[in-house]
Amino acid sequence: MLRFAPSPTGDMHIGNLRVAIFNYIVSKQRKEDLVIRIEDTDKDRNIEGKDKEILDILNLFGIDYSVVMYQSENFRFHRAMALQLLQDKRAFNCFCSSDWLDKKREEAKNSKTAYRYDDACASLPDELVIDNEHPFTVRIRKPLEPIIIKDHIKGEIKFEPNDIDSFIIMRQDKTPMYNFACAVDDMLSDISLVIRGEDHVSNTPKQILIREALGYSKNIEYAHLPIILNDDGKKMSKRDDASSVKWLLEEGYLPSAIANYLILIGNKPPKEIFTIQEAIEWFSLENISKSPARFDINMLKHVNKEHLKILDAKELSRYVGFADAQIGEVAKIYLEEASTTKELRAKIALIFAEKNIPDEFKEYAQTIVKIIQKAPYFEEYEDFKNYIIQESGLKGKNFFKPLRILLMGSEHGPDIATVYKHIKNYLGEIVK
Protein backbone atom coordinates (compact mmCIF):
# COMPACT_ATOMS: atom_id res chain seq x y z
CA MET A 1 0.00 0.00 0.00
CA LEU A 2 1.22 3.48 -0.90
CA ARG A 3 -0.27 6.76 0.25
CA PHE A 4 -0.59 10.38 -0.78
CA ALA A 5 -1.18 12.53 2.29
CA PRO A 6 -2.06 16.17 1.52
CA SER A 7 -3.30 18.75 4.03
CA PRO A 8 -6.46 20.76 3.20
CA THR A 9 -4.78 24.04 4.12
CA GLY A 10 -4.38 25.73 0.72
CA ASP A 11 -4.09 25.31 -3.03
CA MET A 12 -2.29 22.18 -4.17
CA HIS A 13 1.40 22.90 -4.81
CA ILE A 14 3.11 21.41 -7.85
CA GLY A 15 5.51 19.68 -5.48
CA ASN A 16 2.56 17.89 -3.86
CA LEU A 17 1.12 16.99 -7.25
CA ARG A 18 4.51 15.56 -8.24
CA VAL A 19 4.44 13.41 -5.09
CA ALA A 20 0.92 12.23 -5.94
CA ILE A 21 1.92 11.34 -9.50
CA PHE A 22 5.00 9.40 -8.39
CA ASN A 23 2.99 7.50 -5.77
CA TYR A 24 0.39 6.65 -8.40
CA ILE A 25 2.98 5.41 -10.90
CA VAL A 26 4.86 3.27 -8.37
CA SER A 27 1.62 1.83 -6.96
CA LYS A 28 0.72 0.68 -10.48
CA GLN A 29 4.19 -0.77 -11.02
CA ARG A 30 4.03 -2.67 -7.74
CA LYS A 31 0.38 -3.60 -8.22
CA GLU A 32 -0.41 -2.13 -4.80
CA ASP A 33 -3.29 0.09 -3.72
CA LEU A 34 -2.94 3.84 -3.31
CA VAL A 35 -4.74 5.46 -0.38
CA ILE A 36 -5.45 9.19 -0.15
CA ARG A 37 -5.04 10.36 3.43
CA ILE A 38 -6.32 13.87 4.12
CA GLU A 39 -4.17 15.10 7.01
CA ASP A 40 -6.72 17.37 8.68
CA THR A 41 -5.53 17.30 12.29
CA ASP A 42 -4.53 21.00 12.30
CA LYS A 43 -8.06 22.38 12.67
CA ASP A 44 -6.94 26.02 12.82
CA ARG A 45 -5.32 25.85 9.37
CA ASN A 46 -7.86 23.65 7.56
CA ILE A 47 -9.80 25.43 4.80
CA GLU A 48 -13.32 24.23 4.07
CA GLY A 49 -13.65 22.64 0.64
CA LYS A 50 -9.92 22.18 0.02
CA ASP A 51 -10.18 18.42 0.54
CA LYS A 52 -12.71 18.18 -2.30
CA GLU A 53 -10.53 20.43 -4.45
CA ILE A 54 -7.57 18.09 -3.90
CA LEU A 55 -9.62 15.05 -4.91
CA ASP A 56 -10.99 16.87 -7.97
CA ILE A 57 -7.44 17.65 -9.10
CA LEU A 58 -6.35 14.04 -8.62
CA ASN A 59 -9.33 12.88 -10.69
CA LEU A 60 -8.54 15.46 -13.37
CA PHE A 61 -5.01 14.06 -13.65
CA GLY A 62 -6.29 10.48 -13.87
CA ILE A 63 -4.82 9.48 -10.51
CA ASP A 64 -7.11 6.76 -9.21
CA TYR A 65 -6.99 5.42 -5.67
CA SER A 66 -8.60 2.73 -3.55
CA VAL A 67 -9.90 4.79 -0.63
CA VAL A 68 -9.98 8.28 0.88
CA MET A 69 -9.46 8.55 4.62
CA TYR A 70 -9.30 11.49 7.02
CA GLN A 71 -6.61 11.51 9.67
CA SER A 72 -8.99 13.01 12.24
CA GLU A 73 -11.11 9.84 12.02
CA ASN A 74 -8.23 7.93 13.64
CA PHE A 75 -7.95 10.04 16.80
CA ARG A 76 -9.14 7.13 18.97
CA PHE A 77 -6.33 4.96 17.63
CA HIS A 78 -3.76 7.73 18.17
CA ARG A 79 -4.85 8.08 21.80
CA ALA A 80 -4.81 4.33 22.35
CA MET A 81 -1.27 4.08 20.95
CA ALA A 82 -0.10 7.00 23.10
CA LEU A 83 -1.53 5.28 26.18
CA GLN A 84 0.30 2.09 25.23
CA LEU A 85 3.60 4.00 25.00
CA LEU A 86 2.98 5.55 28.42
CA GLN A 87 2.22 2.16 29.95
CA ASP A 88 5.37 0.69 28.38
CA LYS A 89 7.44 3.63 29.68
CA ARG A 90 8.41 4.49 26.09
CA ALA A 91 6.74 7.87 26.56
CA PHE A 92 6.13 10.22 29.48
CA ASN A 93 3.87 13.07 30.55
CA CYS A 94 5.47 16.50 30.25
CA PHE A 95 4.18 19.32 32.48
CA CYS A 96 6.61 21.96 31.24
CA SER A 97 4.76 25.16 30.39
CA SER A 98 5.00 26.89 27.03
CA ASP A 99 6.67 29.88 28.70
CA TRP A 100 9.32 27.64 30.24
CA LEU A 101 10.02 25.89 26.95
CA ASP A 102 10.18 29.23 25.10
CA LYS A 103 12.73 30.43 27.65
CA LYS A 104 14.86 27.31 27.03
CA ARG A 105 14.67 27.84 23.27
CA GLU A 106 15.78 31.45 23.67
CA GLU A 107 18.72 30.36 25.83
CA ALA A 108 19.78 27.87 23.16
CA LYS A 109 19.47 30.55 20.49
CA ASN A 110 21.58 33.00 22.48
CA SER A 111 24.26 30.36 23.04
CA LYS A 112 24.09 29.46 19.31
CA THR A 113 23.29 25.83 19.98
CA ALA A 114 20.48 23.66 18.63
CA TYR A 115 17.57 23.44 21.06
CA ARG A 116 16.93 20.02 22.53
CA TYR A 117 14.39 19.27 25.23
CA ASP A 118 16.31 18.51 28.44
CA ASP A 119 14.07 15.63 29.61
CA ALA A 120 13.05 17.59 32.71
CA CYS A 121 9.91 15.46 33.09
CA ALA A 122 11.32 12.18 31.79
CA SER A 123 12.04 10.69 35.23
CA LEU A 124 9.17 11.99 37.35
CA PRO A 125 7.94 9.39 39.88
CA ASP A 126 4.53 7.89 39.13
CA GLU A 127 2.99 9.39 42.26
CA LEU A 128 3.97 12.90 41.18
CA VAL A 129 2.51 12.34 37.74
CA ILE A 130 -0.77 10.97 39.11
CA ASP A 131 -1.20 13.80 41.63
CA ASN A 132 -0.25 16.55 39.16
CA GLU A 133 -3.31 18.47 37.98
CA HIS A 134 -1.48 20.74 35.54
CA PRO A 135 -2.00 20.41 31.76
CA PHE A 136 0.45 18.05 30.13
CA THR A 137 1.69 16.86 26.78
CA VAL A 138 2.98 13.38 25.98
CA ARG A 139 6.57 12.98 24.79
CA ILE A 140 8.20 9.88 23.34
CA ARG A 141 11.61 9.07 24.81
CA LYS A 142 14.57 9.99 22.64
CA PRO A 143 16.46 7.20 20.84
CA LEU A 144 19.50 5.51 22.32
CA GLU A 145 20.86 4.19 19.02
CA PRO A 146 21.39 5.78 15.59
CA ILE A 147 18.47 5.62 13.16
CA ILE A 148 19.46 4.77 9.60
CA ILE A 149 17.26 5.38 6.55
CA LYS A 150 17.98 3.74 3.21
CA ASP A 151 16.39 6.18 0.80
CA HIS A 152 15.62 5.22 -2.82
CA ILE A 153 16.85 8.63 -4.00
CA LYS A 154 19.23 9.99 -1.37
CA GLY A 155 20.89 6.74 -0.39
CA GLU A 156 21.76 6.07 3.26
CA ILE A 157 20.91 8.81 5.78
CA LYS A 158 22.06 8.41 9.37
CA PHE A 159 20.62 10.22 12.41
CA GLU A 160 22.59 10.09 15.65
CA PRO A 161 20.73 9.84 18.99
CA ASN A 162 21.59 13.47 19.80
CA ASP A 163 19.90 14.62 16.59
CA ILE A 164 16.49 13.78 18.07
CA ASP A 165 15.17 14.81 21.47
CA SER A 166 12.19 13.51 23.43
CA PHE A 167 9.59 15.17 21.22
CA ILE A 168 5.89 15.76 21.79
CA ILE A 169 3.50 13.21 20.30
CA MET A 170 0.23 14.35 21.93
CA ARG A 171 -0.87 17.92 22.63
CA GLN A 172 -2.50 19.10 25.83
CA ASP A 173 -5.92 18.85 24.16
CA LYS A 174 -5.34 15.12 23.52
CA THR A 175 -4.90 15.55 19.77
CA PRO A 176 -1.87 13.96 18.06
CA MET A 177 1.10 15.84 16.72
CA TYR A 178 1.83 15.40 13.01
CA ASN A 179 4.63 12.85 13.30
CA PHE A 180 2.71 10.65 15.71
CA ALA A 181 -0.50 10.64 13.67
CA CYS A 182 1.48 9.99 10.51
CA ALA A 183 3.47 7.09 11.99
CA VAL A 184 0.39 5.42 13.48
CA ASP A 185 -1.66 5.86 10.30
CA ASP A 186 1.11 4.35 8.19
CA MET A 187 0.99 1.33 10.49
CA LEU A 188 -2.80 1.08 10.33
CA SER A 189 -2.78 1.28 6.53
CA ASP A 190 0.09 -1.19 6.18
CA ILE A 191 2.09 1.27 4.07
CA SER A 192 5.05 -0.32 2.28
CA LEU A 193 6.68 2.72 0.65
CA VAL A 194 6.51 6.43 1.48
CA ILE A 195 7.25 8.82 -1.39
CA ARG A 196 7.27 12.47 -0.31
CA GLY A 197 9.27 15.71 -0.46
CA GLU A 198 12.70 16.06 1.08
CA ASP A 199 11.32 18.63 3.53
CA HIS A 200 10.07 15.55 5.42
CA VAL A 201 13.52 13.95 5.81
CA SER A 202 13.84 15.20 9.41
CA ASN A 203 10.39 13.73 10.21
CA THR A 204 11.29 10.25 9.03
CA PRO A 205 13.56 9.17 11.95
CA LYS A 206 10.91 10.40 14.38
CA GLN A 207 8.24 8.31 12.69
CA ILE A 208 10.54 5.29 12.64
CA LEU A 209 11.24 5.80 16.37
CA ILE A 210 7.48 5.89 17.09
CA ARG A 211 6.78 2.70 15.19
CA GLU A 212 9.68 0.86 16.79
CA ALA A 213 8.52 1.98 20.24
CA LEU A 214 5.09 0.53 19.42
CA GLY A 215 6.69 -2.78 18.46
CA TYR A 216 5.98 -2.43 14.74
CA SER A 217 8.62 -4.46 12.95
CA LYS A 218 7.67 -4.06 9.27
CA ASN A 219 10.24 -2.09 7.30
CA ILE A 220 8.77 0.86 5.42
CA GLU A 221 10.77 2.07 2.43
CA TYR A 222 11.35 5.77 1.78
CA ALA A 223 11.98 8.04 -1.18
CA HIS A 224 12.39 11.77 -0.54
CA LEU A 225 12.03 13.92 -3.64
CA PRO A 226 14.28 16.97 -4.06
CA ILE A 227 12.54 20.34 -3.90
CA ILE A 228 11.54 22.35 -6.97
CA LEU A 229 13.29 25.72 -7.40
CA ASN A 230 12.00 28.89 -9.06
CA ASP A 231 13.85 31.07 -11.59
CA ASP A 232 15.85 32.68 -8.76
CA GLY A 233 17.10 29.32 -7.56
CA LYS A 234 14.95 29.48 -4.42
CA LYS A 235 12.35 26.99 -3.24
CA MET A 236 9.05 27.59 -5.02
CA SER A 237 6.58 29.14 -2.61
CA LYS A 238 3.01 30.43 -2.68
CA ARG A 239 4.41 33.73 -4.00
CA ASP A 240 5.28 31.94 -7.24
CA ASP A 241 2.10 31.73 -9.33
CA ALA A 242 3.35 28.64 -11.16
CA SER A 243 3.64 26.76 -7.86
CA SER A 244 -0.16 26.44 -7.77
CA VAL A 245 -1.70 23.60 -9.78
CA LYS A 246 -4.96 25.56 -9.88
CA TRP A 247 -3.18 28.55 -11.46
CA LEU A 248 -1.51 26.38 -14.10
CA LEU A 249 -4.84 24.84 -15.06
CA GLU A 250 -6.49 28.27 -15.26
CA GLU A 251 -3.64 29.48 -17.47
CA GLY A 252 -4.45 26.76 -19.98
CA TYR A 253 -1.90 24.03 -19.28
CA LEU A 254 -3.26 20.54 -19.90
CA PRO A 255 -3.21 18.04 -17.01
CA SER A 256 -1.35 15.58 -19.27
CA ALA A 257 1.32 18.20 -20.01
CA ILE A 258 1.75 19.26 -16.39
CA ALA A 259 2.14 15.60 -15.37
CA ASN A 260 4.60 15.02 -18.23
CA TYR A 261 6.69 18.00 -17.12
CA LEU A 262 6.72 17.07 -13.43
CA ILE A 263 7.92 13.56 -14.29
CA LEU A 264 10.46 14.99 -16.74
CA ILE A 265 12.31 17.45 -14.50
CA GLY A 266 15.22 16.03 -12.54
CA ASN A 267 14.72 12.68 -14.25
CA LYS A 268 16.17 10.54 -17.05
CA PRO A 269 13.17 9.52 -19.17
CA PRO A 270 13.64 7.66 -22.48
CA LYS A 271 11.72 10.40 -24.33
CA GLU A 272 10.58 13.96 -23.77
CA ILE A 273 6.83 13.78 -24.47
CA PHE A 274 4.75 11.04 -22.83
CA THR A 275 1.67 10.27 -20.73
CA ILE A 276 1.49 9.04 -17.15
CA GLN A 277 0.39 5.64 -18.42
CA GLU A 278 3.46 5.44 -20.66
CA ALA A 279 5.69 6.47 -17.75
CA ILE A 280 4.46 3.48 -15.74
CA GLU A 281 6.38 1.27 -18.19
CA TRP A 282 9.82 2.79 -17.49
CA PHE A 283 9.71 5.08 -14.43
CA SER A 284 12.29 4.42 -11.70
CA LEU A 285 12.82 6.31 -8.43
CA GLU A 286 16.52 5.53 -8.68
CA ASN A 287 16.74 7.74 -11.79
CA ILE A 288 15.54 10.83 -9.94
CA SER A 289 18.34 13.32 -9.36
CA LYS A 290 19.41 14.05 -5.79
CA SER A 291 19.73 17.73 -6.70
CA PRO A 292 16.80 20.18 -6.70
CA ALA A 293 14.89 20.51 -9.97
CA ARG A 294 14.49 24.00 -11.45
CA PHE A 295 11.03 24.94 -12.71
CA ASP A 296 11.19 26.32 -16.26
CA ILE A 297 7.89 27.79 -17.45
CA ASN A 298 9.16 27.95 -21.04
CA MET A 299 9.90 24.24 -21.02
CA LEU A 300 6.41 23.61 -19.64
CA LYS A 301 4.98 25.72 -22.49
CA HIS A 302 6.90 23.59 -24.98
CA VAL A 303 5.62 20.36 -23.43
CA ASN A 304 2.09 21.77 -23.32
CA LYS A 305 2.22 22.74 -26.99
CA GLU A 306 3.29 19.21 -27.91
CA HIS A 307 0.37 17.75 -25.94
CA LEU A 308 -2.02 20.18 -27.64
CA LYS A 309 -0.72 19.01 -31.01
CA ILE A 310 -1.56 15.41 -30.07
CA LEU A 311 -5.23 16.22 -29.45
CA ASP A 312 -7.66 15.57 -32.27
CA ALA A 313 -9.43 18.63 -33.69
CA LYS A 314 -12.75 17.90 -31.97
CA GLU A 315 -11.17 17.60 -28.54
CA LEU A 316 -9.02 20.70 -29.05
CA SER A 317 -12.15 22.58 -30.12
CA ARG A 318 -13.76 21.80 -26.76
CA TYR A 319 -10.72 23.17 -24.94
CA VAL A 320 -11.19 26.54 -26.69
CA GLY A 321 -14.92 26.69 -26.02
CA PHE A 322 -16.44 25.14 -29.16
CA ALA A 323 -17.66 21.73 -30.28
CA ASP A 324 -16.77 21.85 -33.98
CA ALA A 325 -13.71 20.07 -35.34
CA GLN A 326 -13.21 22.91 -37.84
CA ILE A 327 -12.55 25.35 -35.00
CA GLY A 328 -10.16 22.78 -33.58
CA GLU A 329 -8.31 22.86 -36.90
CA VAL A 330 -8.06 26.66 -36.63
CA ALA A 331 -6.66 26.24 -33.12
CA LYS A 332 -4.04 23.82 -34.48
CA ILE A 333 -2.96 26.49 -36.98
CA TYR A 334 -2.58 28.99 -34.14
CA LEU A 335 -0.33 26.57 -32.25
CA GLU A 336 2.50 28.10 -34.28
CA GLU A 337 2.21 31.15 -32.02
CA ALA A 338 0.33 29.91 -28.92
CA SER A 339 1.26 27.39 -26.22
CA THR A 340 -1.77 27.16 -23.93
CA THR A 341 -5.52 26.75 -24.28
CA LYS A 342 -5.91 30.22 -22.73
CA GLU A 343 -3.80 31.74 -25.50
CA LEU A 344 -5.70 29.74 -28.13
CA ARG A 345 -9.04 30.87 -26.72
CA ALA A 346 -7.91 34.48 -27.05
CA LYS A 347 -6.87 33.92 -30.68
CA ILE A 348 -10.15 32.21 -31.61
CA ALA A 349 -12.18 34.82 -29.71
CA LEU A 350 -10.71 37.58 -31.91
CA ILE A 351 -12.16 35.88 -34.99
CA PHE A 352 -15.71 36.04 -33.62
CA ALA A 353 -15.40 39.32 -31.69
CA GLU A 354 -16.48 42.77 -32.85
CA LYS A 355 -13.64 44.01 -35.03
CA ASN A 356 -11.54 47.07 -34.25
CA ILE A 357 -10.88 48.59 -37.68
CA PRO A 358 -8.35 51.44 -37.98
CA ASP A 359 -9.99 54.68 -39.14
CA GLU A 360 -8.13 54.70 -42.47
CA PHE A 361 -9.67 51.32 -43.40
CA LYS A 362 -13.18 51.64 -41.94
CA GLU A 363 -14.84 52.66 -45.20
CA TYR A 364 -13.16 49.81 -47.10
CA ALA A 365 -14.13 47.36 -44.36
CA GLN A 366 -17.79 48.41 -44.55
CA THR A 367 -17.74 47.81 -48.30
CA ILE A 368 -16.23 44.33 -47.84
CA VAL A 369 -18.77 43.43 -45.14
CA LYS A 370 -21.71 44.30 -47.39
CA ILE A 371 -20.28 42.20 -50.22
CA ILE A 372 -19.58 39.17 -47.99
CA GLN A 373 -23.08 39.28 -46.52
CA LYS A 374 -24.58 38.95 -50.01
CA ALA A 375 -21.87 36.75 -51.55
CA PRO A 376 -22.51 33.16 -52.63
CA TYR A 377 -20.74 30.27 -50.90
CA PHE A 378 -17.15 29.71 -52.04
CA GLU A 379 -15.31 26.49 -51.28
CA GLU A 380 -11.88 27.93 -52.08
CA TYR A 381 -10.32 31.07 -50.65
CA GLU A 382 -8.98 32.21 -54.04
CA ASP A 383 -12.49 32.27 -55.50
CA PHE A 384 -13.80 34.07 -52.41
CA LYS A 385 -11.01 36.66 -52.56
CA ASN A 386 -11.33 37.29 -56.30
CA TYR A 387 -15.09 37.76 -56.00
CA ILE A 388 -14.71 40.46 -53.35
CA ILE A 389 -11.94 42.21 -55.31
CA GLN A 390 -14.11 42.22 -58.41
CA GLU A 391 -17.20 43.48 -56.56
CA SER A 392 -15.40 46.10 -54.48
CA GLY A 393 -12.73 47.35 -56.85
CA LEU A 394 -10.33 47.38 -53.90
CA LYS A 395 -6.74 46.21 -54.11
CA GLY A 396 -3.45 46.16 -52.24
CA LYS A 397 -3.46 47.02 -48.55
CA ASN A 398 -6.83 48.74 -48.88
CA PHE A 399 -8.26 45.28 -49.56
CA PHE A 400 -6.04 42.81 -47.73
CA LYS A 401 -5.64 44.71 -44.44
CA PRO A 402 -9.37 45.23 -43.70
CA LEU A 403 -10.16 41.71 -44.98
CA ARG A 404 -7.61 40.17 -42.61
CA ILE A 405 -8.95 42.14 -39.65
CA LEU A 406 -12.55 41.23 -40.54
CA LEU A 407 -11.79 37.50 -40.79
CA MET A 408 -9.01 37.09 -38.22
CA GLY A 409 -9.51 39.98 -35.80
CA SER A 410 -5.86 40.98 -36.13
CA GLU A 411 -3.49 42.59 -38.63
CA HIS A 412 -0.99 39.79 -38.08
CA GLY A 413 -1.21 36.02 -37.86
CA PRO A 414 -1.39 32.89 -40.00
CA ASP A 415 -2.14 32.83 -43.71
CA ILE A 416 -5.78 33.74 -44.39
CA ALA A 417 -6.13 31.03 -47.04
CA THR A 418 -5.11 28.36 -44.52
CA VAL A 419 -7.66 29.56 -41.99
CA TYR A 420 -10.46 30.28 -44.51
CA LYS A 421 -11.14 26.65 -45.34
CA HIS A 422 -12.03 26.03 -41.69
CA ILE A 423 -14.08 29.20 -41.04
CA LYS A 424 -15.94 29.55 -44.37
CA ASN A 425 -19.10 28.10 -42.81
CA TYR A 426 -18.95 30.73 -40.05
CA LEU A 427 -18.56 33.84 -42.25
CA GLY A 428 -22.04 35.10 -41.44
CA GLU A 429 -21.21 35.01 -37.74
CA ILE A 430 -17.68 36.35 -38.15
CA VAL A 431 -18.47 39.28 -40.44
CA LYS A 432 -21.43 40.95 -38.79
UniProtKB/Swiss-Prot annotation:
User: What GO terms in the biological process aspect are recorded for it?
Assistant: glutamyl-tRNA aminoacylation
Q: Which SUPFAM superfamilies match?
A: An anticodon-binding domain of class I aminoacyl-tRNA synthetases, Nucleotidylyl transferase
What GO CC terms are in its UniProt record?
cytosol
**Reactions performed catalytically:** tRNA(Glu) + L-glutamate + ATP = L-glutamyl-tRNA(Glu) + AMP + diphosphate
| Molecular functions per Gene Ontology | ATP binding; glutamate-tRNA ligase activity; tRNA binding
Q: What is its EC number?
A: 6.1.1.17
Superkingdom of this entry's organism? Bacteria
Quaternary structure, from the entry: Monomer.
Listed name of the protein: Glutamate--tRNA ligase 2
Q: Which organism is it from?
A: Sulfurimonas denitrificans (strain ATCC 33889 / DSM 1251) (Thiomicrospira denitrificans (strain ATCC 33889 / DSM 1251))
